[in-house]
């Protein structure tokens, strides 16, 4: 789960991380009133969307008067902001964060993530802040530093000293950096975060370190333990089909293709998406119904797939282990009778009760195209939509 910048800063401040502060606006009629509450020489108006690249896309504006700030805020609120992370459709700006500006002497990048390949927690930092870290990694990889923390032993003093040293901090700034490292680590562990990113972490005119922008992504599996964090969820920032799928216990990610996919198991789902591309089409989604899906969940999965107007055909690929093929077949028939399936449908079944499942489908009277293996299924669905 993602949250907005102002929410991320609120969490980080609770853990002792110094951040820039401001006020959030959720209604246009509150813009002028909110800006009047800020007494500052410089105003920073920031669009609040769950995507990076806001600055380059015009979603962050710095102005030097209240009147300018009000005009910029009114112009920005409600626009469709397109960044390199939103895709061409963009994201509507329903919230603004208005801050007091400050002088920036130096910008740094600082984050903490799970490194699955090394089975550890990793700090990533760079003296090149304020830009995409991917760009730094590509052009000047030597400027990226990493420190890995063994979860069994936790954060140690040498980690904090090492990060401060590698970033070039000395004396009081080194002490500040060590405290920030410790605070961010504690926030990461205690909130079940998947990533915390501060970009940029700046040195201001007083020589102090300050988190000027912040992003936190949480592990969905840990949200049950954090109702206060779950309450920060902004459904307007999420695809409504993905929200609907999550409520139904389905793993669904919308994509830009034209072939809807319903599969059991994440690995098989990714293989199915790959082979669709191999045969010349593109997947419209990732959808894993899971191993314990019942008839109603299968039915809801197909409804979600068909709610995407870009879907021109559907490929169902089920390997029945825990999942029974006859349950899948019954769910397909129920969905077809309930909402109608007007696009080509290819079904490949294998595993538990496969013959019973095939029999149910063949006796249904529906126009279902059977496939005997994955390659055959991909070939048939691609040919069917041409």
Swiss-Prot record:
Mg(2+) binds at residues 199, 213. One of its GO terms (cellular component) is succinate-CoA ligase complex. The keyword DNA-binding does not apply. It is an enzyme of class 6 (ligase). GO terms for molecular function: ATP binding; magnesium ion binding; succinate-CoA ligase (ADP-forming) activity; succinate-CoA ligase (GDP-forming) activity. ATP binds at residues 46, 53-55, 99, 102, 107. It holds the Pfam family Ligase_CoA. Keywords: ATP-binding, Ligase, Magnesium, Metal-binding, Nucleotide-binding, Tricarboxylic acid cycle. Pathway: Carbohydrate metabolism; tricarboxylic acid cycle; succinate from succinyl-CoA (ligase route): step 1/1. Residues 9-244 form the ATP-grasp domain. Its cofactor is Mg(2+). Its EC number is 6.2.1.5. It comes from the Bacteria. Binds 1 Mg(2+) ion per subunit. InterPro entries: ATP-grasp, ATP-grasp_succ-CoA_synth-type, ATP_grasp_subdomain_1, Succ-CoA_synthase_bsu_CS, SUCC_ACL_C, Succ_CoA_ligase-like_bsu, Succinyl-CoA_synth-like. Substrate binds at residues 264, 321-323. GO terms for biological process: succinyl-CoA metabolic process; tricarboxylic acid cycle. It catalyses: succinate + ATP + CoA = succinyl-CoA + ADP + phosphate; GTP + succinate + CoA = succinyl-CoA + GDP + phosphate. Belongs to the succinate/malate CoA ligase beta subunit family. HAMAP family: Succ_CoA_beta (MF_00558). Succinyl-CoA synthetase functions in the citric acid cycle (TCA), coupling the hydrolysis of succinyl-CoA to the synthesis of either ATP or GTP and thus represents the only step of substrate-level phosphorylation in the TCA. The beta subunit provides nucleotide specificity of the enzyme and binds the substrate succinate, while the binding sites for coenzyme A and phosphate are found in the alpha subunit. Heterotetramer of two alpha and two beta subunits. NCBIfam families: PRK00696.1, sucCoAbeta. This is Succinate--CoA ligase [ADP-forming] subunit beta.
